[in-house]
Amino acid sequence: MAFAVGNKGYVVCGRGEDNAVCSDMYVYDAQSDIWADAVETPLQARVNGTACAVGDKAYIGLGFCGHAYGDDAYLNDWWEYTPATDTWRRLADFPGENTVGAVAYTDGTHIYCVHGFGWGFSADMLCYDTASDIWTTIDRSRHPEYASMAGAGATCNGRHYFGTGYNTHSLNEWYEIDFRGNWTKRKNVPGKRENAVCAATGQYIYLAGGQHFGGTLTDGKFFDDILRYAPETDSWALAGHTPEAAINRIGFTVNGSAFIGLGEDPQEQPLKTLYRIED
């Protein structure tokens, strides 16, 4: 999971060396290009969690840790983190089942958690009110019956976009979502994939990496491309490639620059490189 507050990016939990699941947090200073040493958090170790910054605070939770058939492996805890004081506060638990691989975005007051997995692929969309600490479910009639997990999305100039993911096969759908929960179909992403990542600049959304599932655990393709989406023209273009193909990368935006990196290579080894993208 990753988010940005001020001039810093924060990377929380995930998978580390020797396939270990982590609960710590690293802080990246975008101005000095320096990573601070890891710090402890009150979070349970997890992968495929969800994080979203609203103003000077971040909201973090959900994810997975444990056995695929254990109820307690699907995490629904939800936390508020204040970087200025380095304090954590436990909030109302997430009431949905789509706790693994959900994507979050904000309108500045509310956080919307979209899709995910929890004993099945979900098409649910839940809204969290940061002022009242209350969760509500968005009416499903406002969006398509398009269920998925491990999708990607970002907000560009106040408009949110979401797509790709997995539901028994890799997906390349791409939608614009307004803050009433209405979905509008946009041009498909080149290359069906899941476990990609997005980060936005002032004009574009960049989508990087991911995997196309080929039908078996050993078949398929890892992506090294960086795709650029232009909301004004609803068009995709190839922006470049990273030196390595990867899944489960992280992404965040600081001062109009997109940062994308880390993740896992095809041999399931963790990667430590972070890339800066400017329009």
Predicted segments with their positions:
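Kelch-like beta-propeller repeat domains
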Residues: 1-279
